[in-house]
Curated annotation (Swiss-Prot):
It is an enzyme of class 5 (isomerase). This is tRNA pseudouridine synthase A. NCBIfam families: hisT_truA. It comes from Actinobacillus succinogenes (strain ATCC 55618 / DSM 22257 / CCUG 43843 / 130Z). The active site is at D51 (nucleophile). Pfam families: PseudoU_synth_1.
Amino acid sequence: MKIALGVEYNGKRYFGWQRQEKVLSVQEELEKALSFVANEKIDLFCAGRTDSGVHGTGQVVHFETEVVRPERAWAFGTNANLPDDIAVKWAKTADDEFHARFSATARRYRYLIYTNPLRSAVLPEGVTHCHLPLDHEKMHEAGQFLLGENDFSSFRAAQCQSKTPWRNVHHLQVTRHGRYIVVDIQANAFVHHMVRNIVGSLMEVGSGRQPVEWMKWLLEQRNRKLAAPTAKPQGLYLVRVTYPERFGIPLSPLGPLFLPDELV
């Protein structure tokens, strides 16, 4: 039997999603809680392995078990055994063909930037602070050069293990909400650090240090060394994973925080 879960987490304390020796990971904490509920060892598969410090509001995972529990028990029982910065949002018995990673057709991220000359004392865990003013309209315009299927070598980490740098970006939207700028991007999949590398370069455009057309040039060069530094992790959220309707995977509100599903 396969069980799918929707998971939310604050990534500040964790060295990423993936289980690793001698460091704290979201996967390890969730597997420990599930194993307690199941009274057997549980191994998880996730839709997207987020990096150290990155958050998730729409992560999807699955596991296989012969243990029978009500869906409610998988959610509430697991939450009772999790730290406060990880939570199960829903639990569902999944089709035998379902796989959290390989059945996914799209991943969606949102990156939050707090634009203010002075930093905030209450926001640093969930946003990236930028003391410079940013032109979100120019950032949005520059982002449109990345739409469609392209070679994203210029925005790919050197340690990326993917066999190909080609990805298909479905949409990229940059909007302003008071002092906050939100970069909303969806693709079929992402190479390592792709979202944060894109955001870092968009911030160069937004600050006026680079022209809008620079993003098009960067994409064409296929050279990571020419792009901007990687944006910090704390502003990044995995907000949704999309699957074929036949699997019946629930869609939670995108968020994070106060953000509605539709940004204007």
